[in-house]
């Protein structure tokens, strides 16, 4: 069965659907030697040859690919880009290496924002989670500097005009602090550039700290250090897929890795047991000889 080329490439982890559409429009993709056009359809067969910038790439049937998702604790100071010409650290630097796929960031966090950033190998999942029409909640813990009164909170809930259109917080909850340094938890259902900061600035309040603590129902994992990552299990991955109307996965790389670790641990235990038995027998034999 044929599928749209951009969907096949996105699913294979070669970028989000929007990124793939851009490189197709730029004439950087070829199918069986012919430059591809946006909207082309392909059928995955053993002889299919797809190239990006002249490099042959790997694509597989949907059922053959395992969708993987990472939760990463982005520190302040890291850029949400694959490569920085100035050599500054990026969010991709610490991620585990992949074969035949690559990590795609689900949205972005600006350089001075820290917290939860999701990555996936499935470009279609990334695209749907980011798209404003899906209205996936993002929750932030924000420390603000300035006087915050009921009128400002009301404006932030009802909506203020930004340079790229109206915006509002879905929820605002006071979470502590004294004087002009206060913490709030806020939620949005879209991911415009620096939107949280710009909303507060629109009512005359400065943001001094910003942490993303949740994406959908996936929280920033407790105990995860800054710069650390953990892979979501099958239930969490399928929650995200079902949230954006993608079919559930039936297997998970996490389960495979856990099984491997369990098998290795069992092998080590058996080896230790055998070693103990052999050593015990030698000691026993030694005592008999001395007797």
From Swiss-Prot:
**PROSITE patterns linked to this entry:** PSI_RSU (PS01149), S4 (PS50889)
**What SMART domains does this protein map onto?**
S4
Q: Where is this region: Disordered?
A: 256-291
So which domain of life are we looking at? Answer: Bacteria
Q: What SUPFAM superfamilies does the annotation carry?
A: Alpha-L RNA-binding motif, Pseudouridine synthase
Q: Name one Pfam family in it.
A: PseudoU_synth_2
Taken from the UniProt record, the cysteine pairs bridged by disulfide bonds within this chain are: none
Cite the entry's keywords alphabetically: Isomerase, RNA-binding, rRNA processing
Q: Where is the S4 RNA-binding domain?
A: 3-75
Catalytic residues, per the record, are 110
EC number, UniProt record: 5.4.99.22
| Described function | Responsible for synthesis of pseudouridine from uracil-2605 in 23S ribosomal RNA.
**PANTHER family per UniProt:** PSEUDOURIDINE SYNTHASE FAMILY PROTEIN-RELATED, RIBOSOMAL LARGE SUBUNIT PSEUDOURIDINE SYNTHASE B
* NCBIfam families registered for this protein in UniProt: PRK10700.1 (NF007976), pseudouridine synthase (TIGR00093)
Which protein are we looking at?
Answer: Ribosomal large subunit pseudouridine synthase B
Instruction: Supply the source organism for this entry.
Output: Escherichia coli O6:H1 (strain CFT073 / ATCC 700928 / UPEC)
Gene symbol of the encoding locus: rluB
């Amino acid at each position: 069965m044929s599928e749209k080329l951009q969907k096949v490439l996105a699913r294979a982890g070669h970028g989000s659907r929007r990124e793939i559409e851009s490189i197709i429009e730029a004439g950087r993709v070829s199918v069986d030697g012919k430059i591809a056009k946006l909207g082309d359809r392909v059928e995955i067969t053993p002889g299919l040859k797809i190239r990006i910038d002249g490099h042959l790439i790997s694509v597989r049937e949907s059922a053959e690919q395992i969708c993987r998702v990472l939760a990463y604790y982005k520190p302040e100071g890291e850029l949400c880009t694959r490569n920085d010409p100035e050599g500054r650290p990026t969010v991709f630097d610490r991620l585990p290496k992949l074969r035949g796929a690559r990590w795609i960031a689900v949205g972005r966090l600006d350089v001075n924002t820290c917290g939860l950033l999701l990555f996936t190998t499935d470009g279609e999942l990334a695209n749907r989670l980011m798209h404003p029409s899906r209205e996936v909640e993002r929750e932030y813990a924000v420390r603000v500097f300035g006087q915050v009164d009921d009128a400002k909170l009301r404006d932030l809930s009802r909506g203020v005009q930004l340079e790229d259109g109206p915006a509002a917080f879905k929820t605002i909850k006071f979470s502590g602090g004294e004087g002009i340094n206060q913490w709030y938890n806020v939620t949005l259902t879209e991911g415009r550039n620096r939107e949280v900061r710009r909303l507060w600035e629109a009512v005359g309040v400065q943001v001094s700290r910003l942490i993303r603590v949740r994406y959908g129902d996936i929280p920033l994992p407790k105990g995860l250090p800054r710069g650390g990552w953990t892979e979501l299990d099958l239930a969490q991955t399928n929650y995200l897929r079902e949230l954006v109307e993608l079919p559930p996965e039936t297997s998970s790389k996490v389960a495979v890795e856990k099984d491997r670790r369990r098998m290795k641990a069992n092998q080590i235990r058996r080896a230790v047991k055998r070693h103990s038995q052999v050593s015990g027998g030698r000691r026993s034999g030694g005592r008999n000889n001395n007797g």
